[in-house]
Amino acid sequence: MAALRLLAWALPRGVSALRPPPALPHRLIRRYVSDRSGSVHFYTDPVKAVEGVKDGSTVMLGGFGLCGIPENLIGALKTKGVKDLKIVSSNVGVDDFGLGILLASKQVRRVVCSYLGENALCEKLYLAGELELEMTPQGTLAERIRAGGTGVPAFYTPTGYGTLVQEGGSPIRYAPDGHLITLSEPREVREFQGRFYLLEHAIRADFALIKGWKADRSGNVIFRGSARNFNVPMCKAADISVVEVEEIVDVGTFAPEDIHVPNIYVDRVIKGPKFEKRIERLTTRDSKPAPGSKDNDPSRTRIIKRAALEFQDGMYANLGIGIPVLASNYISPKMTVYLHSENGILGLGPFPLKNEVDADVINAGKQTVTVVPGGCFFASDDSFAMIRGGHLQLTMLGAMQVSQYGDLANWMVPGKKVKGMGGAMDLVSSKKTRVVVTMEHCTKTKQPKILKKCTMPLTGKRCVDLIITEKAVFEVNHSKGLTLVELWEGSSVDDIKATTACSFAVSPNLKPMQQIKLDA
């Protein structure tokens, strides 16, 4: 009200507030800035910046992998020694950096995340009963956080229907002897326009620890590259948001339209004393695969070259790590395909040269990447709005198992292997997006991966549209089952029957397995 009175006083009589006002006196500008910055506190000591975090607090940690993590504030939590923390994070980084530091010091009671990645310590603590782990689809996690920041208590999403997320029973806590103590609860389900949706509840935290690029002296924040990720929605969803930045600049340095998080969401700012900005998976296009690596496997190359035929000019596509990403190397230069990465990039380019590597520009597989001209960055909640909203024409990903009706399992082996679903459940949840699975036909122990019914926890139910292996290509009808449409020249229909654990039809137009031509 005081600001409105000042504005009314400054406007000449008869001048509408709807019209562009004359410039305000400089003393008023100073008054406005000093009034607002008084509610944003600036710190030089990271430990003091996290004052108020106590045993049992719920803390959101921004970032994706190691990109955009608040490394100085995480270090401050370790120094502070608080314990029994409930951490909300997109994933858990690595053993000795990021969230891994707090796990190693046994300060965390529960982690709410979507993906463990390569953090063997987290997986070990979880399976040993020393850590509670609440796995949530990445897009659902982003939306739960966004809802928490906007005052929306709950929402419905198609993600996770027909999986453990909906049914409940996903292991949250094991006992030291290996038996289950805590399981996830089933979700409420409602039908809208012939589709089933799960009720998900918003998440809020006591504290959000955020990594920005720059902040001005009134607390407005901007981010760099793909480091926007979960930082933006988390900054809005906590009682106290603490932002560490690389630089603090004067008010007015940022154009108003360039500000990513307005100061109304920011409580504390600190310029980080130092930044390691470690890269989890340094990948360059001028590095050659090691001898004996999978990249030199002829069977793998065969799948890649067949998968590349699924791209169409003008398509928006999301590619999983491994074979799907490698298939993009074969996109024709005559064709434009907009590659989406769920951590917040549209317009992925090739891997960088060594002198182009940027820790703030990574893909969903934590690899260093480039962005093509016309590409853009955005936050994780926007990214999954694109996914769930059906704005992608294609998603291509790997699998542990696929059923004859298109059920997909690719995120968990109970009691043995826990990686998490990441964004996969969201990617296969849109009916408008074609789902292509690329995988080897059998496991390393020669067990079929195409089954009558998946035995592992599902990622999605009746969602796969096409299966590509080194032996064959199957089209999937969600009510009728599989049809063999392409066969590698070294295989036979009898061979496919012997290595596929379900029935399938054979197309009357069965043809040799197609391969993209390098000059196509």
Swiss-Prot record:
This is Succinyl-CoA:3-ketoacid coenzyme A transferase 2A, mitochondrial. InterPro entries: 3-oxoacid_CoA-transf_A, 3-oxoacid_CoA-transf_B, 3-oxoacid_CoA-transferase, CoA_trans_fam_I, CoA_transf_AS, CoA_transf_BS, NagB/RpiA_transferase-like. It comes from Mus musculus. Belongs to the 3-oxoacid CoA-transferase family. Residues 1-39 form a transit peptide. Its EC number is 2.8.3.5. The lineage of its organism: Eukaryota, Metazoa, Chordata, Craniata, Vertebrata. Homodimer. It comes from the Eukaryota. Pathway: Ketone metabolism; succinyl-CoA degradation; acetoacetyl-CoA from succinyl-CoA: step 1/1. The keyword Repressor does not apply. GO terms for biological process: ketone body catabolic process; ketone body metabolic process; succinyl-CoA metabolic process.
